[in-house]
């Protein structure tokens, strides 16, 4: 994951100080891209230990179309707690937009189901896109989508995915986002009968929070370790049938976890 450390180092050396919504302050650059060959290993950061359980359950929760944290709480995942209301609701966030985008005529569009159907019918389509950024509903969301839009691409029997992340919390958020969309790419590839290709991460406002600088500097002193591999249950043939038990991370070795505060 040298690409990730290179981004962190670039922001430390060239980032502009900016105020932000949380009042914490950030050091920021605009526009950055990282590419990960999924055949070379699963892109889970090794310079600090990452909590894969949270990554997997969050992705499954998105795919369910859920916007209440009850499922996450049931499985010991607390990453959305700070934004939920007293009933555990978050408003029309990722899962709702992915699975039930409201159309003007009253219909609800299942973008994920449409994507899977299009992949099988016309894998060369340039419309293999899912968007979570719905301007009409931004004000109703507890947190507007940071990872806003992703697109799939098929070539030579391989499936690649590119994510556009408008707001990228480099220390805490980005390692989760890379692993989450890499995992989604593996899942979609298996169901569609394709091999995994690349995951391409494109960031807009790429920032380190001012209270993450010491942690980032510590991480930059560490040497990346070999990437692990991710095994999926080959019996799963429908994207919505995946369960937590269908994933096995093999050979993950990482440096110790580095704690940092979440900016809410």
Swiss-Prot record:
- Binding-site positions, (6R)-5,10-methylene-5,6,7,8-tetrahydrofolate: 51, 169, 263
- Its Gene Ontology molecular function terms? thymidylate synthase activity
What range does the record give for the signal peptide? none
For this protein, the Enzyme Commission number is: 2.1.1.45
Give a Pfam family name.
Thymidylat_synt
What biological-process GO terms show up in the record? Answer: dTMP biosynthetic process; dTTP biosynthetic process; methylation
Location, primary (coarse class): cytoplasm
Q: Which Gene3D superfamilies match?
A: Thymidylate synthase/dCMP hydroxymethylase domain
Q: Which UniProt keywords apply?
A: Cytoplasm, Methyltransferase, Nucleotide biosynthesis, Transferase
The record's annotation in PROSITE patterns points to: THYMIDYLATE_SYNTHASE (PS00091)
The active site consists of: 146 (nucleophile)
- Please tell me where dUMP binds in this chain: 21, 126-127, 166-169, 177, 207-209
Location(s), subcellular = Cytoplasm
Quote the cellular component terms of the Gene Ontology held in the record.
Answer: cytosol
Instruction: List, alphabetically, the SUPFAM superfamilies matched.
Output: Thymidylate synthase/dCMP hydroxymethylase
Q: What class does this enzyme belong to in the EC scheme?
A: transferase
Q: In which pathway does it act?
A: Pyrimidine metabolism; dTTP biosynthesis
Catalytic activity field: dUMP + (6R)-5,10-methylene-5,6,7,8-tetrahydrofolate = 7,8-dihydrofolate + dTMP
Function in brief = Catalyzes the reductive methylation of 2'-deoxyuridine-5'-monophosphate (dUMP) to 2'-deoxythymidine-5'-monophosphate (dTMP) while utilizing 5,10-methylenetetrahydrofolate (mTHF) as the methyl donor and reductant in the reaction, yielding dihydrofolate (DHF) as a by-product. This enzymatic reaction provides an intracellular de novo source of dTMP, an essential precursor for DNA biosynthesis.
Q: Which NCBIfam families does this entry report, sorted A to Z?
A: PRK01827.1-3 (NF002497), PRK01827.1-5 (NF002499), thym_sym (TIGR03284)
Its subunit composition reads: Homodimer.
UniProt family annotation: Belongs to the thymidylate synthase family. Bacterial-type ThyA subfamily.
Instruction: Output this protein's name.
Output: Thymidylate synthase
């Amino acid at each position: 994951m040298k690409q990730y450390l290179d981004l962190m180092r670039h922001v430390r050396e060239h980032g502009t100080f900016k105020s932000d919504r949380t009042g914490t302050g950030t050091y920021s650059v605009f526009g950055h891209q990282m590419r990960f060959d999924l055949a070379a290993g699963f892109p889970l950061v090794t310079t600090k230990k990452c909590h894969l359980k949270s990554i997997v359950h969050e992705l499954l929760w998105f795919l369910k179309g859920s916007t209440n944290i009850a499922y996450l709480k049931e499985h010991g995942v607390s990453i959305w707690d700070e934004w939920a209301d007293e009933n555990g609701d978050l408003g029309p966030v990722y899962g709702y937009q992915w699975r039930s985008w409201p159309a003007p005529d009253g219909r609800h569009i299942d973008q994920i189901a449409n994507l899977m159907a299009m992949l099988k019918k016309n894998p060369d389509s340039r419309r293999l896109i899912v968007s979570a950024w719905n301007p009409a509903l931004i004000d109703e969301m507890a947190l507007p989508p940071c990872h806003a839009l992703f697109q799939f691409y098929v070539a030579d029997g391989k499936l690649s995915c590119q994510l556009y992340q408008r707001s990228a919390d480099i220390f805490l958020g980005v390692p989760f986002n890379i692993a989450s969309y890499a995992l989604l790419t593996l899942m979609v590839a298996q169901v569609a009968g394709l091999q995994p290709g690349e995951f391409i991460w494109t960031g807009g406002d790429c920032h380190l929070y001012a209270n993450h600088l010491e942690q980032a500097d510590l991480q930059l002193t560490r040497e990346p370790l070999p990437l692990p591999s991710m095994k999926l249950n080959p019996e799963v043939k429908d994207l919505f049938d995946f369960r937590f038990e269908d994933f096995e991370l093999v050979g993950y070795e990482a440096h110790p976890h580095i704690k940092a505060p979440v900016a809410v």
